[in-house]
């Protein structure tokens, strides 16, 4: 709707301007401060300019009123125009707020947790954000592909195999073992040890078989990770292996050398990242000739940036903040525009239950498992809460609030609005088709504002995607639900003289809730279950 209004205004004003959304919809639905920017050029006061501009909009079908107020140009949308938009939305509900196909393309890499254990709650935040960003981008018409980078090489995979070997020796063979400083622990390691012992037999468990044991366990963990993601309604298009990039390392090093991006010193090969804004240079090849994790990651990012996407997006944990300058430096040395590599950071999550820290999982050692939280509160509540705050800010929430059936539980409160609308239609004995001819002319000011809010979802979705600020969607839903409940409590619907107008208004509210929830990966309920 906002883009339509913008274009209508531009036809008349014939110049560029900013279109704002005033908080008080009783004053205006849209406003522009254009008169202030024209004041110097026209040598007139903003008030006079705004008044002159307002006079150009007389008898325009889109607007109920266009007024000059303190230098601003305030626009109120007409009921007739809002009704036209409502008819379009209700006639084609599956296309409501969808964007036209765009040329811009994106590759999103996210989650990419080491396949050494189940996903924990820290992984879950980036996973939910990435999946929702994907749903939103595709809905708005962008080409958007997703990928999981499987870290299946290096020391962490070897440690997984070693941890299982030591668990077999200790818990099954009852040998005395000495654990290294770093190893994986938890019930899942014991379970893997039991399964491996049954599969391979006693003779298999020696140090020389650690790589084979690690590979077997890594594959098991990747299956588990995919199950964890599926449980939260998250689907990633493709999984790529770190090992598959081994053969490309030398070519990447040659390219970096050619562009003076690396140098040798102290028997190591260094990335000259300090030349590109990093705080210091970074080792990419050790003295023994082995590549560091950074080396493998550079090869992978070179491949991603070469695939022709307009932008490559990564979602990383906030602890990877210092990693950004070195990766962007490497991409610049390789001839890419580092602005086309976008990094979104997912901050830490603190989980409470009844005001106390949530218990760590025995299965995973010192972590809260994503699957445990989904089992307790459901994927809808998990997804909502992880989207309720900007991804790069710390998130603390008490899962007890998400089990309440009142306004303190936002998922319940919003779903209750959706279910309430279905209940009202049932009580009136009507369906949406029965109210399509209603013209909405009887709506009072609060009703018009509620209708405007429901129809303004497209603008919210565009803003949320462009700013990568997905919290705008749950914020919108909370306000929409609150305004609906208030309006419902203040207005008689069934049996009223304007019943059809109100039911048509409500159907738009329900459509907006269902559409926004769907993009968040949440099911809108037609009936509340107790």
Swiss-Prot record:
Quaternary structure (record): Monomer.
Upper lineage: Bacteria, Pseudomonadati, Campylobacterota, Epsilonproteobacteria, Campylobacterales
Sequence motif 'HIGH' region, location on chain: 113-123
Chemical reaction(s) catalysed: tRNA(Arg) + L-arginine + ATP = L-arginyl-tRNA(Arg) + AMP + diphosphate
PANTHER family named among the record's database cross-references: ARGININE--TRNA LIGASE, CYTOPLASMIC, ARGINYL-TRNA SYNTHETASE
Species of origin: Campylobacter jejuni subsp. jejuni serotype O:2 (strain ATCC 700819 / NCTC 11168)
EC number(s) on file: 6.1.1.19
One Gene Ontology term from the biological process aspect of the record: arginyl-tRNA aminoacylation
Keywords, alphabetical: Aminoacyl-tRNA synthetase, ATP-binding, Cytoplasm, Ligase, Nucleotide-binding, Protein biosynthesis
Protein name: Arginine--tRNA ligase
UniProt GO molecular function: arginine-tRNA ligase activity; ATP binding
One Pfam match: Arg_tRNA_synt_N
GO CC list: cytoplasm
Top-level class of the enzyme under EC nomenclature: ligase
Subcellular localization: Cytoplasm
Family designation: Belongs to the class-I aminoacyl-tRNA synthetase family.
Domain of life: Bacteria
Alphabetical list of InterPro entries matching this protein: aa-tRNA-synth_I_CS (IPR001412), Arg-tRNA-ligase (IPR001278), Arg-tRNA-synth_N (IPR005148), Arg-tRNA-synth_N_sf (IPR036695), ArgRS_core (IPR035684), DALR_anticod-bd (IPR008909), Rossmann-like_a/b/a_fold (IPR014729), tRNAsynth_Ia_anticodon-bd (IPR009080)
């Amino acid at each position: 709707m906002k883009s339509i209004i913008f274009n209508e205004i531009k036809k008349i004003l014939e110049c560029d301007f900013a279109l704002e959304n005033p908080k008080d919809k009783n004053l205006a639905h849209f406003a522009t401060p254009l008169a202030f920017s024209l004041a110097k050029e026209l040598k007139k006061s903003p008030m006079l300019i705004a008044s002159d501009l307002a006079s150009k909009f007389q008898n325009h079908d889109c607007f109920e009123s266009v007024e000059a107020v303190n230098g601003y140009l305030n626009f109120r949308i007409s009921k007739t125009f809002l009704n036209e938009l409502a008819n379009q939305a209700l006639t084609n509900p599956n296309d409501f707020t969808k964007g036209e196909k765009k040329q811009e393309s994106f590759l999103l890499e996210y989650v990419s947790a080491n396949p050494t254990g189940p996903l924990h709650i820290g992984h879950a935040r980036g996973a939910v954000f990435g999946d929702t960003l994907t749903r939103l981008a595709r809905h708005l018409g962008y080409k958007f592909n997703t990928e999981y980078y499987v870290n299946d090489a290096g020391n962490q995979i070897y440690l997984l195999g070693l941890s299982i070997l030591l668990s077999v020796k200790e818990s099954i063979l009852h040998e005395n073992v000495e654990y290294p400083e770093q190893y994986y622990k938890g019930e899942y390691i014991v379970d893997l040890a039991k399964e491996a012992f049954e599969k391979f037999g006693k003779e298999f468990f020696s140090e020389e078989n650690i790589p084979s044991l690690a590979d077997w366990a890594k594959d098991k963990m990747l299956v588990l990770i995919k199950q964890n993601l599926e449980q939260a309604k998250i689907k990633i298009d493709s999984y790529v292996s770190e090992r598959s990039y081994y053969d490309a390392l030398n070519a990447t090093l040659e390219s970096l050398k050619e562009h003076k991006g690396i140098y040798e010193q102290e028997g190591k090969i260094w990335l000259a990242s300090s030349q590109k804004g990093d705080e210091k240079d970074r080792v990419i090849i050790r003295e023994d000739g082995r590549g560091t994790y950074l080396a493998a990651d550079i090869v992978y990012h070179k491949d991603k940036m070469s695939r022709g996407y307009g932008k490559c997006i990564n979602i990383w944990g906030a602890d990877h903040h210092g990693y950004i300058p070195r990766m962007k430096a490497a991409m610049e040395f390789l001839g890419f525009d580092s602005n086309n590599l976008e990094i979104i950071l997912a901050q830490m999550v603190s989980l409470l239950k009844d005001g106390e820290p949530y218990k760590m999982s025995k299965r995973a050692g010192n972590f809260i498992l994503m699957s445990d939280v989904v089992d307790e509160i459901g994927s809808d509540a998990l997804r909502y809460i992880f989207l309720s705050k900007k991804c790069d800010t710390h998130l603390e929430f008490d899962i007890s609030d998400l089990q309440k059936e009142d306004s303190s539980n936002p998922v319940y409160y919003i779903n209750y609005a959706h279910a309430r609308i279905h209940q009202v239609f049932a009580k009136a004995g009507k369906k949406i088709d029965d109210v399509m001819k209603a013209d909405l002319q009887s709506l009072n000011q609060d009703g018009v504002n509620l209708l405007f809010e429901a129809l303004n979802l497209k603008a919210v979705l565009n803003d949320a995607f462009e700013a990568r600020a997905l919290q705008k969607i749950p914020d919108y839903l909370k306000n929409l639900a609150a305004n609906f409940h208030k309006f419902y409590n203040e207005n008689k619907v069934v049996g009223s003289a304007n019943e059809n107008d109100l039911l048509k208004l409500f159907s738009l509210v329900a459509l907006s809730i269902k559409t926004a929830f769907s993009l968040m990966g949440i099911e809108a309920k037609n009936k509340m279950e107790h």
